[in-house]
């Protein structure tokens, strides 16, 4: 099996890769964020990278976090697909537990992403956060220290979910991340006829969010981000309540 992630992807049957997928597989950046439309192939890439890390770096701990068990199960299935393509099916018990330990002592664990579920883990070599726009900010702050000693890699992937939360903060912030934006218009597997149908069926802000990677104001947001920003002034002194 080839050690190079790009060659490894081809070895598990992914020969027809998009340009952004090729760049991602060739990247060695320690922090990666994927802002992608639905059905762009981001979960498949995350699964390939998780499996590659576990196979080629013995003793690795690979954690896959998602907002709910359903999403964790979906991404774990991408790992299992790659493993099967190598002729090594994952035991049925691993599907139930959403975790597998390989012969080289590497472990892959897929977890519903809450702060409590990850407290027992440390020293992750690869940490993948799926649907990152919908995980609690507390989870992100809890997992970052897990990479301190291991020097591990973090990959966040999601479609946007409003101008709020850690995914939006990281995407728009100054911190150095390897950033990938993949809209439906750039995905060869999504046809224009389908997108036209979606434009007619969906509210415009939903379409922009789901297919154009746009961070939109959410429908349950009483005050828009612009309204909040406009209300903040550095000229106003903090209120002294006389406490302390």
Predicted segments with their positions:
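ASCE P-loop NTPase helicase motor core
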Residues: 81-84, 89-90, 126, 134-202
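Conserved Walker A/P-loop ATP-binding site and its immediately adjacent core
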Residues: 59-81
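Pre-P-loop entry segment of helicase/translocase ATPase cores
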Residues: 1-31, 239-242
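Conserved H-loop
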Residues: 39, 67, 159-162
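ATPase catalytic-site recognition across NTP-hydrolyzing enzymes
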Residues: 187-244
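Inter-Walker segment of RecA-like/P-loop motor cores
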Residues: 73-125
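Catalytic acidic motif of RecA-like/P-loop NTPases
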Residues: 39, 130-134
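Walker A/P-loop
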Residues: 29-50
């Amino acid at each position: 099996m080839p050690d190079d992630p790009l060659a490894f992807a081809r070895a598990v049957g992914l020969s027809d890769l998009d340009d952004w997928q090729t760049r991602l597989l060739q990247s060695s950046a320690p922090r990666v964020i994927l802002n992608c439309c639905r059905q762009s192939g981001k979960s498949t890439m995350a699964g390939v990278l998780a499996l590659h890390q576990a196979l080629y770096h013995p003793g690795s701990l690979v954690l896959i976090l998602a907002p709910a068990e359903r999403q964790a199960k979906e991404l774990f299935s991408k790992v299992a697909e790659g493993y099967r393509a190598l002729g090594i099916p994952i035991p049925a018990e691993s599907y139930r537990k959403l975790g597998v330990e390989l012969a080289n002592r590497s472990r892959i664990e897929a977890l519903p992403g809450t702060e409590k579920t990850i407290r027992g883990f440390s020293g992750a070599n690869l940490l993948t956060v799926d649907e990152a726009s919908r995980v609690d900010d507390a989870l992100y702050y809890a997992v970052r220290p897990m990479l301190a000693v291991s020097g591990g890699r973090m990959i966040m992937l999601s479609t946007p979910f409003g101008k709020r939360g850690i995914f939006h903060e990281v995407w728009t912030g100054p911190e150095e991340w390897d950033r990938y934006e993949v809209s439906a218009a750039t995905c060869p597997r999504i046809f224009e006829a389908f997108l036209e149908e979606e434009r007619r069926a969906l509210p415009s802000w939903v379409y922009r969010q789901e297919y154009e990677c746009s961070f939109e104001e959410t429908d349950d947001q009483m005050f828009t981000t612009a309204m909040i920003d406009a209300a903040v002034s550095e000229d106003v002194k903090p209120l002294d309540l006389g406490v302390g």
